[in-house]
Amino acid sequence: MATGTFDIIHPGHGFYLKKAKELGGKNSKLVVIVARDSTVRARKRKPVINEKQRLEVVKMLKPVDEAYLGCEGDIFKTVEKIKPDIIALGPDQDFDEKELQKELKKRNIDCKVVRIKEYKKSPLDSTCKIIKKIKQMKFDDIEKC
């Protein structure tokens, strides 16, 4: 299982999802949980792309077998429903692996938590970097869009 906002898709997302799927082995199935707009606003910032569109795009990505919107409020409800063998965390996700593992154990969810390393092959390797670059650009020919 992989989770995330997936607001403006970039190569780091592809790397994360590919590595998450590889964790499960040859015939693994990757289920992706896309964060709800309310969750993104509470934890990060207002999303650029709404949750339904983000989900639609994630479903189209090659490593993804299934994708769903997360539950409002208790993020563990989705995990309890899916019962993954592995939860792959992205490098920028603010979960502490040990605390997450403790909470999973408390809820009788037997799965491994693995942090995927950072993707640094692209200067625009995060949604925030993309947003900052767009804000800095002067679009003299915006009418052509």
From Swiss-Prot:
Q: Which pairs of positions does the record mark as disulfide bonds? A: none
Pfam families xrefs: CTP_transf_like
Alphabetized UniProt keyword annotations: ATP-binding, FAD, Flavoprotein, FMN, Nucleotide-binding, Nucleotidyltransferase, Transferase
- Biological or metabolic pathway of the protein: Cofactor biosynthesis; FAD biosynthesis; FAD from FMN: step 1/1
Coiled-coil spans in chain: none
The EC designation for this entry is 2.7.7.2
Q: Which cofactor does it need?
A: a divalent metal cation
Single GO molecular function? ATP binding
Q: Which residues does the annotation say bind ATP? A: T5, F6, H10, P11, G12, H13, D92, Y119
Q: Which reaction does it catalyse?
A: FMN + ATP + H(+) = FAD + diphosphate
| Domain of life according to the entry | Archaea
| GO biological process entries | FAD biosynthetic process; FMN metabolic process
Q: Does the keyword Nucleotidyltransferase apply?
A: yes
Main function: Catalyzes the transfer of the AMP portion of ATP to flavin mononucleotide (FMN) to produce flavin adenine dinucleotide (FAD) coenzyme.
- Family per UniProt? Belongs to the archaeal FAD synthase family.
Q: How does it assemble?
A: Homodimer.
Show the PANTHER family listed in the entry: FAD SYNTHASE
Question: What NCBIfam families does its record include?
Answer: cyt_tran_rel
Question: What is this protein's record name?
Answer: FAD synthase
